[in-house]
Amino acid sequence: MRLWLCWLGCYTLLLWALRRRMWAGPARYLRSPLSRSLYANMMGSHGPPAPGAGENHQWYVCNTEQLSESLQPIFVQSYLDQGTQIFLNNSIEKSGWLFIQLYHSFVSSIFSLFMSRTSINGLLGRGSMFVFSPEQFQRLLKINPEWKSHRLLDLGAGDGEVTKVMSPHFEEIYATELSETMIWQLQKKKYRVLGINEWQNTGFQYDVISCLNLLDRCDQPLTVLKDTRSVLEPTRGRVILALVLPFHPYVENVGGKWEKPSEVLEIKGHTWEEQVNSLPEVFGKAGFAIEAFTRLPYLCEGDMYNDYYVLDDAVFVLKPV
């Protein structure tokens, strides 16, 4: 209770200080993002569009001339579609929920002393990710909306929001996750959560395995790739895999500390296209070939400082060889 009263007092002082600054000039002179957010909410304004909102088409641009000859014909051009725009609109709206954002910021600062950021997000139910819309998923896999298969395994599924995009196509949905709070979110969605050392030893195979933005955040990415190959249905099975490029692998530990992984993927080059060119060899060592790939934005819900966050993803469909 004392902690809450202390926080409330600090917040009141912040409002008082902000009010004094407002008398000195309009909102454009408020340099702090928090101050601008407070001002906009108090004035009933949603503020200007998010910076760079008019440049969203750049998220999908690939210079195909810089791709190797074998990769050029299997590149799938993607675009900003309705599903992506809905996520962006919802994220922008949530970032304007001032008191909720302040509460999230306060809780995060306390819990970060003994919890990872991922677990904090799972506890608060915030920070959902977006990799692809249902239409983008179907186009990449070359399936129609009515297509059905048996088993899906989503490795590192987080809160299950991306799993939800794929789940209508499968009879059984399995997921893995390290964070206990994210496991709780997955169980609320009725997904079958398997242990980190359990999914490789279930005795059955999966028709589709998704590994979305996991390899750059796990300790043994090569082992994950090889284990994925061993439990994939050998003829019709497919892996849908996303990597943030440029590739910067780190593993998050309790307390938000980041460490280098014990296994290294030999991804070469500097640009998005150069690193994509080196990936057929990486996947080949694990028994996969690239069937199709695209460039998509890896989006995350924002906070009081940004409407949303975005990284550059390369999303691959891999087939066993």
From Swiss-Prot:
Keyword set includes Membrane: no
Organism per entry: Gallus gallus
PANTHER family named among the record's database cross-references: DREV PROTEIN, PROTEIN-L-HISTIDINE N-PROS-METHYLTRANSFERASE
Entry keyword annotation includes Iron-sulfur: no
GO cellular-component term (any): mitochondrion
UniProt signal peptide: 1-24
Glycan attachment positions: N89
Record gene name: METTL9
Reaction it catalyzes: L-histidyl-[protein] + S-adenosyl-L-methionine = N(pros)-methyl-L-histidyl-[protein] + S-adenosyl-L-homocysteine + H(+)
GO molecular function, one term: protein-L-histidine N-pros-methyltransferase activity
One Pfam family, short name: DREV
Annotated localization: Endoplasmic reticulum; Mitochondrion
InterPro entries, per database record: METL9, SAM-dependent_MTases_sf
Residue positions binding S-adenosyl-L-homocysteine: E177, N213, Y298
EC number: 2.1.1.-
Function of the protein: Protein-histidine N-methyltransferase that specifically catalyzes 1-methylhistidine (pros-methylhistidine) methylation of target proteins. Mediates methylation of proteins with a His-x-His (HxH) motif (where 'x' is preferably a small amino acid); 1-methylhistidine modification may affect the binding of zinc and other metals to its target proteins.
Biological process according to GO: methylation
Major localization listed first in the record, in broad terms: endoplasmic reticulum
Protein name, per record: Protein-L-histidine N-pros-methyltransferase
Family: Belongs to the METTL9 family.
Keywords: Endoplasmic reticulum, Glycoprotein, Methyltransferase, Mitochondrion, Signal, Transferase
